[in-house]
């Protein structure tokens, strides 16, 4: 079964998304938030295409603007939490879609790059 493949923008982000210890450190010791991050990453990896994530209301998949145009965010846990996973859909050659019309590409995207996990609205 071919699932969504995740590419990480850097090693630090990869460690934060795959290590309970690193994720807990990122969230200031909040182990529940860290476990939620790892669960979100697992769900992304198990999806057939990115559309499977977009249609999940609890993920609150939404586009970003300004300097992050072409990127999207999903909640690490809930909308009440400030933490977001910032990601970008990539084509089969691992290039960003330009333009990135998510409605047109969601059913075919099988690769995403996770740029960062951040307190996006601080």
Which residues are covered by each model-predicted region?
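Arg/Lys-rich, positively charged N-terminal/basic patches that mediate binding to nucleic acids
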Residues: 1-42
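Short, surface-exposed charged micro-motifs
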Residues: 5, 63, 73-75, 86
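Generic, well-ordered alpha-helical segments
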Residues: 29-36, 52, 56, 68, ...
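A generic structural signal for short beta-strands and their flanking turns/coil linkers
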Residues: 40, 60, 68-72, 83, ...
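Acidic, glycine-rich loop-and-strand cores that form catalytic or ligand-binding grooves
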Residues: 42-48
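Short, solvent-exposed coil/turn linker segments
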Residues: 48-49, 60, 98, 105
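A short, surface-exposed loop/turn module that caps and links secondary-structure elements
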Residues: 49-73
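Enriched for short, Lys/Arg-rich terminal
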Residues: 76-122
């Amino acid at each position: 079964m071919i699932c969504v493949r995740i590419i990480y923008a850097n090693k630090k982000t990869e460690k934060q998304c795959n290590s309970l210890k690193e994720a807990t450190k990122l969230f200031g010791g909040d182990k529940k938030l860290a476990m939620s991050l790892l669960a979100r990453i697992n769900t992304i990896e198990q999806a057939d295409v990115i559309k499977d994530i977009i249609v999940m209301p609890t993920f609150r998949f939404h586009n970003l603007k300004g300097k992050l145009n072409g990127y999207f965010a999903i909640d690490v846990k809930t909308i009440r939490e400030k933490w977001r996973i910032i990601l970008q859909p990539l084509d089969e050659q691992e290039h960003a879609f330009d333009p990135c019309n998510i409605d047109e590409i969601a059913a075919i995207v099988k690769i995403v790059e996770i740029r960062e996990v951040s307190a996006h609205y601080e």
